[in-house]
């Protein structure tokens, strides 16, 4: 959105704050920010504009503390997670051509997501240092939550990763999974989403009204475990 919209939102914010007896920027509190957010008729633009303003104000010494992280998040309705059956997922995995470099990579990453419920972003960012080959564990700090997580390095996952490493492009990068054309860098999670979508379509799996990204493997595993009574 344009500069005029940003200025309008900022003007409304400062006018509202002034009605709350905050006469100076340093007087602005978390409660003021929350009240202004609730009063806004354009919360989406409000959030981004005011977050930027509060960060800028703190960086320039106009405010003693950066309060940008206290701008409330927009409450969104969460739909029902997409779930694919175990048979559908196994069909997709089995159909991957594992004789190619890209096939070995796709199989290993999707297997990690399907068996361990790892988010696609975490699977794509997996590093060699995350794997303990002796203890047979995968230890990461989840990108979305920042929470540490230790998962078992299942035999089939270990085998799939090793087969990919043997075919992996020569690179000193610490990330395991790379794009296969120079310049090498970690695989984007959007590429993994595309690979699963292609597999679903190629195998004739019904995706009507369903999401098709690799994150669906996480929700599918959770659903499968619940059915089996594993919590």
What do these predicted ranges mean?
Residues 93-120, 144:
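Basic, Lys/Arg- and aromatic-enriched nucleic-acid-binding interface segment
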Residues 1-80, 95-99, 173:
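N-terminal core-binding DNA-recognition domain of tyrosine recombinases/integrases
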Residues 97-98, 151, 194-231:
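Short, basic (Lys/Arg/His-rich) helix/loop patches that form interaction surfaces
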Residues 11, 51, 107-121, 223-227:
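Short pre-functional
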Residues 143-162, 174-197:
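C-terminal catalytic core of Y-nucleophile DNA break-rejoin enzymes
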Residues 2-4, 27-28, 78-102, 106, ...:
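Intrinsic, low-complexity N-terminal interaction/targeting segments
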Residues 130-133, 188, 230-231:
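Short, polar N-cap/turn motifs at the start of nucleic acid-interacting alpha helices
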Residues 116, 125-160:
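Conserved tyrosine-mediated DNA breakage-rejoining catalytic core shared by Y-recombinases
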């Amino acid at each position: 959105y344009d500069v005029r919209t940003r200025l309008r939102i900022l003007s409304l914010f400062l006018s509202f704050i002034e009605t709350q007896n905050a006469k100076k920027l340093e007087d602005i509190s978390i409660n003021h920010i929350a009240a202004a957010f609730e009063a806004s008729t354009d919360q989406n633009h409000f959030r981004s504009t005011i977050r930027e303003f509060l960060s800028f104000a703190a960086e320039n010494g106009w405010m003693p503390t950066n309060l940008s992280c206290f701008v409330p998040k927009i409450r969104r309705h969460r739909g029902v997670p997409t779930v694919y059956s175990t048979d559908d997922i196994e069909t997709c995995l089995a159909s991957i051509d594992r004789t190619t470099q890209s096939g070995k990579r796709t199989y290993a990453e999707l297997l990690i997501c399907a068996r361990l419920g790892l988010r696609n972003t975490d699977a794509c960012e997996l590093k060699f240092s995350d794997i303990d080959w002796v203890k047979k564990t995968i230890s990461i700090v989840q990108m979305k939550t920042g929470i540490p997580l230790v998962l078992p390095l299942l035999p089939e996952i270990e085998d799939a990763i090793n087969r990919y490493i043997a075919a992996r492009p020569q690179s000193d990068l610490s990330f395991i999974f790379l794009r296969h054309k120079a310049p090498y860098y970690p695989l984007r999670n959007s590429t993994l989403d595309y690979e699963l979508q292609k597999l679903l379509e190629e195998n004739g799996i019904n995706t009507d009204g369903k999401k098709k990204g690799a994150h669906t493997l996480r929700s599918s595993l959770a659903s499968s475990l619940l059915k089996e009574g594993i919590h």
